[in-house]
Amino acid sequence: FENLCRLMSEAETKGKYYKPRIDHDLMEQYNEGIICLSGCASSEISVRLRNGDKKGARKLVDWYAKVFKDRFYLEMQDHGHPDSPTHWDAQNKINLGLQKIAKETGLPLVVTCDGHYLCHADAEAHEILLCIGTGSNLSDPNRMSLKDFQLHVIKPEDIISRWGQDFPEAIRNTKRIAERCEVELELGRILIPKFPVPDGEDEKSYLDKLVFRGLVYRYCGTSLAETEALSVAECR
């Protein structure tokens, strides 16, 4: 869990470009204890399978398997309509590619649901959220939209109906992954990290000092050395 938090922090503070990002070096450095899945249709493995780059996909799979060992799974999804599983041909192409790689390598498959929102009824709210994030209008026919896909958290019985006959082991692997997750988070209290502060200060007094000194330095024409010698009262 600590490694996962480290990766998230690095992605947000150092790797962000529109979205938080991490690279292979970071994953290799902080992989211990983390279970890794090959990702949705936009992952680097899936994109190569979509584009017909089977060698490139296999090379990446081999790298992930080497780094994460028995904690790496090939991830199948299907967000077309339940009555038409191949509604999105690209997803079907990815799944077939993953199934082939699983046979060649012996790596385990797992079925997942790319849940962007909880219930199917939340799809419209999700479209509005996408508009806010991309600065577009609902009326724009060329805007980013995911309305053609079912991205809610699918009920277990629907997953079993879709995958159970052909890939029962891939469904069982979801339970195996859950059983391997050993972190228990304490709920009901604030879990904000403790920020290191100088002797004689608490978090509030130190924040006040930084804020007021920052205001004086930026707007009163004093030097940095002069500003750092001021108390909060003098800054006010």
What are these regions (language model features)?
Residues 1-236:
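Phosphodiester-processing cores and adjacent nucleic acid-binding clamps
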